[in-house]
Curated annotation (Swiss-Prot):
Disulfide bonds: none
One GO CC term on file: cytoplasm
Keyword tags: Cytoplasm
Pfam families recorded: TLD
Family annotation (InterPro entries): TLDc_dom (IPR006571)
Annotated TM spans: none
Protein name in UniProt: Restriction of telomere capping protein 5
Assigned protein family: Belongs to the RTC5 family.
Positions of region (Disordered): 173-201, 332-359
Function of the protein: May be involved in a process influencing telomere capping.
Subcellular location: Cytoplasm
Pro residues composition bias: residue spans: 343-359
Length: 689
């Protein structure tokens, strides 16, 4: 690994691949870290590094201990006997691969030196956007390579062969030799393969980083070592262990304590985690994945339905950028105690702050959820975006307010209307129930929808121009959390849909409809012609009694609609030149277009209101003046107070329409028949349409 060289010709300077890798790491450090962060990183690394032959490095034990990653024995199970998650070997395999960037054929697995650690931190945190040409797309490729463990030869044998090949090739190369570059080969998984998915090679993402180092030719030769096709995959067990680790650490904040989430977990929590992990694995159709998960399946899953899966790695590896040994605040506090006369010195603003207390995402009050729990919330955070600036719901301090529960408030559209129609903010609908199969077996199912607009304004999407490419937080989302993870993203062409295709629709006669085509009102409409029709990639219908929900998922049979078919992202769909083109592309997804319909017997239905990080935001109302916007909770309570006052006002209406007692009784009878007073007074039921 340390003998690879490039020979540019007689009398010219010889540059090794390792030297180029170090120079690239320094570029990464200067571009992605502040001087203070580098100081903390150096202290953390070198104070714990092992020394062998003058090389300072970290091994798996040091990395796992510092980051607090469970590193138990045994590879068969991802949950150890003490309730911890055994993710240490998986994480170390990832960093050993990424530390060799971009010379994976030559250097992977790399020794975890300081230079390798710099590249690992950049690539595993959100700083990767500064160095990767295509951002998230390139990162998915790197993450797949770091996890792929099927199709690789035994590492020990491979390194021995690499060392022997290196010595032999260096001896053969000379001034008159045709061999321009000599270096050992790395993982066989990294040898170029002729994939059928149409993806570009990884050349672009590394060429941009190397163009200023005069190393492009070396990199290209590194990629041309062997043109033999090698199939590489991620083993199911490796991905399962990583998913479980990411599931429990999703709420991790910068400088937070990871052991708080990975140790001492109860059997019920571990069971819930396992259910959600198996749901995600089920989305990969494991029966068709013999030997592991290929790149195409991995890329489609991450890109279309789990875009924020690896977000927990950012706060995890940013622990390396803060050293307790250099905690200026603690040192000065200790000095002030020893010297009472010493004046307090303000902490420099560049000192890494301690992690602020984590505000609860799920707010108390209203009702105790029978659906939403911390594990389910972690699952939602992998694909649900509530703000454009910081998509992850744990990082952007989004809070969920309990709005409606069929268990607490009753299975009534009247109660649903009272609680939900008065909520003037985005919301999440969750449904838990059972699906009965043809063999009479009942299977627990959890589905839901993210609705970025208040229910009353379901048809007010005409303000969004069709030429704009909206972010995920402004588009609706229909999803299934279990038993099979499925995400149907909102169409970026909502503004061009017909008026009879609202995001949500509410009627006391037909119930609740999401992503459906609504028939025009007509006195002659009877039976099935009167019911909302499924459209687009997916639809959800709930009967007026809130007892049965019907989820329809289509591969393109229902044409255009509010939601895209599964496997299509809003970003890729936005490239379509028109709705006609989009409909044609969605219709060609499956060779045999079909609908999948699930009839779910509802156990519980809940609506959770989404509150942004700042419940009282200030916006510019007019030049020189500001208005304070009320948060959704205050608005809802004000609406309820108004309705209560109106009901009370109607009760005290002067019913004396005449001067005699007979006229008074007649007037009251008229008011009762009108439903203004008495037991039959207006219940306040609202219609969305």
């Amino acid at each position: 690994m340390g003998a690879s060289q490039s020979t540019n010709g007689p009398g010219q300077k010889t540059t090794s691949v390792e030297e180029l890798s170090k120079r690239l790491a320094y570029r990464f450090a200067n571009k992605c870290f502040t001087p203070l962060e580098l100081t903390h990183l150096k202290d953390n690394f070198f104070s714990r590094a092992l020394d062998q032959g003058g090389i300072r490095y970290w091994n798996e034990e040091i990395l796992s201990e510092f980051l607090g990653i469970p590193d138990g024995a045994g590879s068969a199970a991802y949950v150890t006997s003490d309730g911890s998650l055994d993710a240490g070997p998986v994480i170390f395999r990832m960093v050993s691969y990424l530390g060799a960037f971009p010379f994976h054929n030559t250097m992977a697995p790399s020794v975890l030196t300081f230079e390798a650690m710099v590249k690992v931190i950049v690539l595993l945190t959100e700083r990767y956007g500064k160095v990767l040409k295509r951002g998230r797309k390139d990162r998915v490729k790197l993450l797949f390579g770091s996890l792929a463990d099927v199709g690789r030869r035994d590492i020990v044998v491979q390194l021995q062969e690499a060392a022997e090949d290196s010595l032999e090739l260096i001896g053969e190369a000379g001034p008159g030799s045709d061999r321009t570059f000599t270096h050992p080969t790395g993982f066989s998984v990294d040898k170029p393969a002729h994939d059928d998915d149409g993806e570009e090679d990884d050349d672009d993402l590394a060429l941009a980083a190397l163009e200023s180092l005069d190393a492009i030719e070396i990199f290209k030769h590194d990629q041309r070592i062997d043109k033999t096709v090698y199939e590489s995959k991620i083993s199911i067990n490796t991905f399962r262990r990583l998913l479980a680790f990411l599931m429990v650490t999703a709420p991790l904040r910068p400088l937070g304590t990871i052991s708080k989430y990975t140790t001492g977990l109860s059997s019920s929590i571990l069971e819930t985690v396992n259910e959600q992990v198996e749901s995600i694995l089920a989305a990969l159709a494991l029966d068709d994945l013999e030997g592991g998960i290929g790149y195409k399946s991995f890329s489609e899953l991450i890109s279309t339905s789990l875009p924020y899966l690896f977000d927990p790695l950012t706060p995890l590896f940013e622990h390396l950028l803060f050293s307790k040994n250099l905690d200026v605040t603690r040192k000065r506090h200790s000095q002030s105690q020893n010297d009472p006369a010493a004046k307090p010195v303000p902490t420099p603003p560049s000192t890494p702050p301690s992690s602020p207390p984590l505000s609860p995402v799920i707010l108390n009050g209203g009702f105790d959820s029978s659906i939403l729990n911390p594990t389910l919330l972690s699952h939602l955070s992998f694909f649900l975006s509530t703000t454009a600036q910081i998509p992850n719901i744990f990082r952007n301090r989004t809070r969920l307010h309990p709005v409606f529960s069929s268990t607490e408030h009753g299975e009534s559209l009247t109660s649903f209307s009272h609680h939900v129609m008065t909520w003037q903010a985005p919301s999440i609908l969750l449904i838990k129930g059972v699906v009965t199969s043809e063999s009479d077996e009942e299977q627990i199912t959890t589905i839901g929808a993210y609705l970025p607009q208040p229910w009353k304004q379901s048809s007010s999407n005409s303000s969004r121009r069709s030429s704009d490419v909206p972010d995920q937080s402004t588009l609706p989302c229909l999803f299934e959390l279990s038993p099979v993870h499925t995400v149907l993203q909102g169409s970026p062409s909502l503004s061009s849909l017909k008026p009879n295709m609202p995001i949500t629709y509410f009627s006391t006669k037909t119930g609740i409809a999401i992503g459906c085509q609504i028939p025009p009102p007509s006195r002659k409409s009877l039976g099935a012609d009167f019911l909302p029709k499924p459209s687009g990639g997916g639809s959800l219908l709930i009967d007026p009694a809130l007892e049965v929900a019907t989820l329809v998922i289509s591969d393109g049979l229902n044409g255009e609609g509010v939601f895209l078919p599964p496997g299509i992202s809003a970003h890729s769909a936005s490239k379509s030149v028109s709705c006609t083109t989009l409909a044609a592309s969605t219709a060609s997804i499956s060779a045999s277009n079909h609908n999948t319909t699930k009839s779910i017997s509802i156990y519980s239905l809940e609506v959770w209101g989404i509150i942004p990080s700042q419940s009282l935001s200030v916006q510019l109302d007019s030049p020189g003046s500001f208005v304070e916007k009320q948060d959704a909770i205050t608005q809802q309570r004000a609406q309820w107070d108004f309705e209560a006052r109106e009901a009370e006002r109607r009760k005290v209406i002067n019913m004396k329409v005449g001067v005699g007692e007979l006229e008074e009784h007649s007037g009251r009878a008229l008011l009762e028949m009108a439903g203004i007073v008495g037991d039959s007074q207006y219940s306040g039921l609202r219609h969305l349409r």
